């Protein structure tokens, strides 16, 4: 076959990868595809909750991830999630194509896939495509809004100490540089009372309050915040709301406009399993013109959402790989994913509660948590627990030694097996036993 024919075939396949409708064969190789189609037919009548405990269904999904057989068990998917192998392969193929002639294939071929991708992301989020900007992560998305809104000296912004660190730093920088007032609430999580949280934000409001910044799912311990109730309360006082959806989009079953916020930013490389370094910004259409772009644009006061995509040279392979992640995600379904991951979290957390010396720092009730939970072992610092889990048991978690939290964050994903969680529980049991008062007393004798 000629080089020209090869290239034409490659481009055709690339287009299919970016926008093709989901099919079992597009997720797995031929063997897995047949199995998945059979499972889908068999479990079609199951509710998401019923399907959450059907291990033969999920074992097929698990085989789509190379991470499921990695030497280190990754239980920090809240930080960044691996992509299914087909997403990795798509990015690799797009990268190969780009390197055949970067300026041509990136700008004139792959870049043409952005508008179809925008439409598909909007469909998943229940939004207008003209409200969706594609970028690299939640920090970039939310910093666009944080730095893009006009505020005057003395104007107040309300957040909390458990918002994501990069967002807190952005507000503190504006406070230091421009003289705005950044007020932060403190909470004792877990909280199983929405009204208590809403009231805390309400009581912090003054006549100078302009913005409330709220995190949908608290990244530290997984608390789900009552975003819709906070937004409604804020709007009653004429206050805009910025929503950090880094840990909710692609995991919780919701539509962005239903939250009733004004601005929403997320990373796509968490529970959507998109390529690492992909994100999204949503701005309510009538608010777009008032937000200055984070990076320069020729029409900064435009109503066109694309003014927030002036990133210069970016990774088009990563951006277009989002399309395959959407295929994979939509093949499962958001509600099915939510119920499965919540089941996995409760599976290990409920058993961990039976281990003497182990404490869970997260609610196990559905309205208040999903994937993430914090765990601690008496007698161990968070960093000591994290280090022991990794060095002795090859389990990767992340220590959270922050404010009133002293725990390790654990976050499974759809590729996590029950046997993986059993391994984690055995490790917790061993470490809790070694650090029990009885054993510690014997060591000191």
Language model features: what each stretch is:
Residues 2-445:
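Pyridoxal 5′-phosphate
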